[in-house]
């Protein structure tokens, strides 16, 4: 079965937030609905920040993928970060992750992105295998974070 990909708009905020809360719950990340709503509204009304695609199977919403933009001198220009990629549990391991990554790689080339980055939890072996299958590689670097 083939997925359809719909570019998200502010009208989709509620649907995305429902899935985002499930996504965050997988690894026990805190989820503040009011804060998430403000962040999502800002993102979806600022196309220079990135894009979110809704994953649809027939008429059913089964997931989403958020691609954010940034700039890198090392990599030669605008790059993308696959910030969030969620598929509802009952639809996993059915090829929809592969379909989504295939689609996003095409879109990234259309957007003239130089590189795509992503991060995954160490325990997410299925996700890591999928990303490796699509050519994502571990860099011999550490992603460090400082909250401001």
Name each model-derived stretch.
Residues 98, 122-140:
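Conserved active-site alpha-helix within GNAT-family acetyltransferase domains
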Residues 8, 85-87, 120:
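Hydrophobic adenine-recognition pocket in adenosine-nucleotide-binding enzymes
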Residues 91, 95-103:
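Conserved acetyl-CoA pyrophosphate-binding loop and the N-cap/start of the following alpha-helix
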Residues 101, 109-119:
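Conserved GNAT acetyl-CoA-binding A-motif
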Residues 7-14, 18-77, 83, 101, ...:
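Acetyl-CoA-dependent GNAT
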Residues 2-4:
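Extreme N-terminal starter segment of soluble prokaryotic enzymes
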Residues 88-90, 94, 122-123:
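Active-site acidic-Proline motif in GNAT/NAT acetyltransferases
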């Amino acid at each position: 079965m083939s997925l359809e990909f719909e570019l998200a708009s502010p009208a989709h905020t509620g649907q995305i937030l429902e899935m985002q809360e499930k996504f965050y719950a997988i690894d026990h990340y805190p989820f503040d609905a009011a804060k998430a709503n403000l962040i999502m509204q800002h993102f979806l009304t600022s196309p220079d920040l990135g894009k979110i695609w809704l994953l649809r199977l027939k008429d059913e919403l089964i997931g989403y993928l958020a691609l954010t933009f940034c700039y890198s001198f090392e990599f030669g220009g605008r790059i993308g970060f696959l910030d969030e990629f969620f598929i509802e549990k009952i639809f996993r391991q059915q090829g929809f992750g592969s379909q989504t990554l295939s689609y996003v790689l095409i879109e990234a080339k259309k957007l003239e992105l130089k590189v795509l980055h992503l991060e995954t939890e160490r325990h997410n072996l299925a996700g890591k295998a999928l990303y490796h299958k699509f050519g994502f590689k571990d860099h011999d670097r550490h992603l460090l974070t400082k909250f401001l």
